[in-house]
Amino acid sequence: MNWLAEKTIKHKGAIIVVFTLMVVFSVFAAPNVSINYQMADYLPEDSKSTVSLNLMNKEFDKSPPNVRIMLEDVSIAEALSYKEKISKIDGVKEINWLDDSVNIQQPLDMIDTDTLNSWYKDNNALFTALVDKGDTLKQTIEDIKEIVGDKGIVAGDAVTENYAKTSTSEEIQKIMLFIIPVIVLILMISTSSWFEPFLFLFTVGISILINSGTNIFLGEISFITNATAAILQLAVSMDYAIFLLHRFSEFREEGLEVKEAIVNAMKKSYTSILSSGLTTILGFLALTLMRFKIGPDLGIVLAKGIVFSLLAVMLLLPVLTIYTYKIIDKTAHRSFMPSFEKFSKIALKIGPIVVIIVAIVVYPSYLAQGKNNFTYGASSMASSEKTQIGKDTKKIDDTFGKSNQIVLIVPADDPVDEKEIGEEINNIEGVTSIISYSNNVGNEIPKDYVPKEQLSDLVSGDYSRMIITISADEESDIAFNAVKEMSELGKKYFGDNYYIAGGSPSAYDIRETVTSDNVITTLGAIIAIGVVIMLTYRSLSIPIILLIAIESSIWINL
């Protein structure tokens, strides 16, 4: 790599121009990268919930409601007025209330209690609405909130997605505002110049910006990738810059001229930087082995980010160092890092004890990490009372009960089995209602006698749709057990010709896919990183020792 070090210094101007052009491109490209907030879109194409969702969108014109709106302390007349106003908002496709189920001109005492309490309870009204989740979603939600004002509370899948969109960018900014000063402080303590930390951050920041801009060539990235890529790239890449400038400082102390010192620093540090970078890249690329496509999405972006970080450190940082070495010299300070000589002696003495302790706790830690509870979708934000949307969701749930809809699609030519499966589903824990042709209309009534608009919600040309409501959070044990039991019943009555969709089925499939992916990605990462370490150190024992130490620390941490 000696030639690269010399060529880099020789073509300083060209390197500055190339990086400047990439930065200019990225400044305009990064804001235009499409962000996907639907976790279910990253399931394998052959997963049951994905196939089911595609079929439902093809066979049925309308999806189930995705917004719940509660109005507090309103009369029937006031509720109808609010419903009328909300229905006129752009993006609101449909809104339902009590008047769509019963004749509200009759006295409330005459209305079935369960039906009444589902829509109007203790002077509180609950609407369900279907809104377009496209580019107008944010404005639609804002318009609804503006109309209902202080009297209203808005929740549901569409609101959760909108919250994810708005909160993600805000949270990234908060994290960056917190972590950058911390990094600067740590770097100031660990370096020998007040200016070096800002040079590090500038170099890595350039690589982060370029990585963000080049994401436009991927078409779209997930909101998880968008939220974590920059922070992870910053955390992982900073070491490369520190390696190089520490070497530079050492050669300057030996009396070498600036250019000679930076060339020697590049030659001496390239091996450690490249081997470290390569192990990181391969670790991230191991995520591409996942069937759950969040893995490849995140892995490719992060691996690409490390490549740009390596290029920035190996090409841009040496050039910037040559241009700014006078500032580095003027802002030089003594090292604030303590001597680790005593620590190293203590570590060597207690090393055998530490090995014994780790050997004792590592297996229980491995078993314990398998018992961790994970969340698999954006709905976890709605179930957390730490967020405003979580508080709003709880308030609606406390008044009208939880409402989690699951769609089961079955062949339309078998009404007897449809009715029987509906009766069995009704006995599943958590199920509060089933809307289907056989259940709400009746198989004895010919389809020709049912209004076309109502019929199309439940029956298409080949399939019948059952909309099942369960009183449980999307990712709760009750919901997952319900999905499992419904799938078993679907297979019992219709073989493989049944389809199940909704938030809970998608989260269930994500959980099953991620669980199976975990073994593959872990093995892939271990093999790839082990090979790199083996080639770097030309040893068989060192990779084994390092990987055992790394995996043990991961299990203990989890």
What would you call each of these model-derived segments?
Residues E45-A158, N373-I542, I548-L558:
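Structured non-transmembrane domains adjacent to transmembrane bundles in polytopic membrane proteins
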Residues I35-Y37, N103-I104:
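Surface-exposed, low-hydrophobicity interaction/linker segments
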Residues M1-I35, D132-F374, K491-L558:
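Membrane-embedded transmembrane helical bundles of large multi-pass transporters/channels
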